From Swiss-Prot:
Disulfide bonds: none
Organism lineage: Eukaryota, Metazoa, Chordata, Craniata, Vertebrata
GO BP terms in the entry: defense response; vasodilation
Annotated source species: Physalaemus signifer
Tissue specificity: Expressed by the skin glands.
Protein name per the record: [Ala1,Thr6]-bradykinin
Length: 9
């Protein structure tokens, strides 16, 4: 996953 990416937001 790219930096700053969050599936939970």
């Amino acid at each position: 996953a790219p930096p700053g990416f969050t599936p939970f937001r």
